[in-house]
């Protein structure tokens, strides 16, 4: 069983252990296991860990292109329904003629009321609405406690998932080759700049991997990682497809324009 760790980073071992425990519960107790919200990398790990026929796996974040999703692990004779994911969506109401609400202020407000990041999913911005998705067990607490986001007074209105106003997204998918899976090399490819410049950005704390600042240029990235470079934006490393004859890694990036 310990051999599974060699395929992942050392800092991912705690999550691997958690995933193995979820799997054990399903196998031994013959019941579904619902997780908190997982980021894309955690979804990749969970998919790898549960890769056996006797345990099924399904994800939902409330809409098709959701980034953060809850997972259900289930016995093979059970088929989960959407309601089993226990998601609640909200409209965020505020005086938009006088103040604005952005992703950072709303994220900070949710964390500020003591809500753990695992308890809420995507924050969705469209031309007509700001909406968010939380776990159903925290919905009443969030509705009662979230009254301010930045300088804006806010209130929440419960809505059905079908009423989410998901904007159309123009996605750029780009294939490339990189000499290494080091963070500086991948960031250089992702942002189309020199490796030296990428090293400087990493060392200056301007690069995040899965929402955490990483200042080590030699950090090895993995499939499913979300990379963020300040001033450039975010890209998902969606595929790593082995090496070319010239010993370079084939990678695929996905970026929302």
Swiss-Prot record:
Q: What happens when the gene is disrupted?
A: No alteration in cell division. Has a synthetic lethal phenotype when disrupted simultaneously with trans- translation; double ssrA-ylmH deletions grow poorly at 37 and die at 49 degrees Celsius.
Gene Ontology terms: biological process = rescue of stalled ribosome; ribosomal small subunit biogenesis
Checking InterPro entries in the record gives: Nucleotide-bd_a/b_plait_sf, RqcP2_N, RqcP2_RBD, S4_RNA-bd, S4_RNA-bd_sf
Q: Where is the S4 RNA-binding domain?
A: 181-251
Asked if the record carries the keyword Protein biosynthesis, the reply is: yes
Chief location bin: cytoplasm
Cell compartments where the protein resides = Cytoplasm
Effect noted on mutating residue 182 to A:
Synthetic growth defect with ssrA deletion, no longer associates with 50S ribosomal subunits, does not complement rqcP deletion upon overexpression, does not increase Ala tailing
Which UniProt keywords are listed? Answer: Cytoplasm, Protein biosynthesis, Ribosome biogenesis, RNA-binding, rRNA-binding, tRNA-binding
**Residues covered by region (N-terminal domain):** 1-74
Q: What is the effect of changing residue 197 to A?
A: Wild-type protein function
The UniProt entry, under Gene3D superfamilies, shows: 3.30.1370.160, 3.30.70.330, RNA-binding S4 domain (3.10.290.10)
Q: Where is this region: Central region?
A: 87-166
MF terms from GO for this chain are: ribosomal large subunit binding; rRNA binding; structural constituent of ribosome; tRNA binding
Question: Which Gene Ontology cellular component annotation is one that this UniProt entry carries?
Answer: cytoplasm
UniProt effect for mutating residue 195 to A = Synthetic growth defect with ssrA deletion
Record comment regarding domains? Has 3 domains, an N-terminal domain (NTD) which contacts helix 69 (H69) of the 23S rRNA, the central region which contains an RNA recognition motif (RRM) and the C-terminal S4 domain which interacts with the P-site tRNA and H69. The NTD and central region are required to complement a double ssrA-ylmH deletion and to bind 50S ribosomal subunits. The ribosome binding site of the S4 domain overlaps that of RqcP.
> What this chain does, per the record?
Part of the ribosome quality control system (RQC), a ribosome-associated complex that mediates the extraction of incompletely synthesized nascent chains from stalled ribosomes and their subsequent degradation. RqcH recruits Ala-charged tRNA, and with RqcP directs the elongation of stalled nascent chains on 50S ribosomal subunits, leading to non-templated C-terminal alanine extensions (Ala tail). The Ala tail promotes nascent chain degradation. RqcP2 (YlmH) overexpression can compensate for RqcP's role in Ala tailing during RQC, restoring Ala tail addition to peptides in stalled ribosomes.
The UniProt subunit note reads as follows: In the presence of chloramphenicol (a translation elongation inhibitor), but not erythromycin or lincomycin, associates with 50S ribosomal subunits with or without a tRNA in the P-site. The S4 domain binds in a similar position to RqcP.
- Specify the protein name: Ribosome-associated protein quality control protein P2
